[in-house]
Amino acid sequence: MKYINRRLTIEKISLQKIANKFGTPFYSYSYSKLKENINNFKKSFRSFSPLICFAVKSNTNVNIIREIKKFGLGADVVSVGELMMALKAGINPSKIVFSGVGKTTSEISFAIDKKILLINAESLSEIKEINRIAKSKNKRIKIGVRLNPNTDAKTLSQISTGKKENKFGVNKNTFYEIINYCKNSKNIDLKCLSVHIGSQILDHRPYEKMLKAVSQILNKTNHKFEFIDLGGGMGITYTDKNKKLNYKKYNTAILKFLRKHKVKIIFEPGRSIIGDTGTLVSKIIYIKAVSYTHLTLPTIPTV
């Protein structure tokens, strides 16, 4: 956003004019910024042509997803609602990955029927349920398993997901148990190892540590994975404009990893694609005086 003639604008359009026409509150998104973010991400990792699946959880607006789809991106979903939204936006099912810790039987069944690329499981019990459902449909499907690499993302504890005390993923012992189970299962094909260590990460070093942990795990098994899903978590700057994730160094670490392991990389960016493209615009309707300060009360609904 920029000020033009003392008016705050987005894409050179006055936010005041938009408010006058449509009322408030509303979300306003910059298409040029969205395009810039996507192209920058694709360019940064073009050396190995990853599958980029937009994390729908970061923005479920079907019109936004539809625009993102035009750049060739797939979708990462964590619920049947997000899956339906991705399909409605025109995302090819062969580019959709279904993640998340609490998939229901009906959600798994729906995902199988839609022939999406992968269902990333979070536990052995979930894999057994996926296998049961696939067997009932007489289908063989591709799945992934999320590994907890015990890697500190150096981010807020509330959004850290890759340490051993976090609820996400399975530990090493369970991971090897899952591999053995899948080898003896006719209806599931374990194709992907998935990791995701946290959100709002601005330092490339936790990613390097994560890749080393994954490499060590792969070296201890003869199972052939087709995909390594590195998740997302790439942060954006809110206050310190000089602190940005170094994509170049992350790319270098991945290339080093790929020299040892011949796999297809999947990314699940969300915030890094959409986070700085939109603005919530509201109107101040009241000013309330309290001790030592004043509160402005905007017209933003709570639902």
What is the role of each PLM region?
Residues E177, K183-L202, P206:
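Gly/Ser/Thr-enriched, mixed-charge loops and adjacent short helices
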Residues E126-S185:
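Conserved anion-binding
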Residues V78-G81, S99-K103, K142-L156, L190-V195, ...:
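Non-cysteine beta-strand/loop elements that form the S-adenosyl-L-methionine
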Residues G23-P25, D113-L118, S157-G169, D203-R205, ...:
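Glycine-rich tight-turn/loop motif centered on a GG-T
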Residues M1-I141, N180-D189, N219-K224:
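A charged N-terminal "starter" segment
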Residues H294-V303:
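Single conserved hydrophobic/aromatic residue that forms the stacking wall/gate
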Residues I197-L295:
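C-terminal active-site-proximal or functional interface alpha/beta core segments in diverse enzymes
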Residues N61-I64, E82-M84, T104-E107, P149-K164, ...:
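Conserved radical SAM core fold
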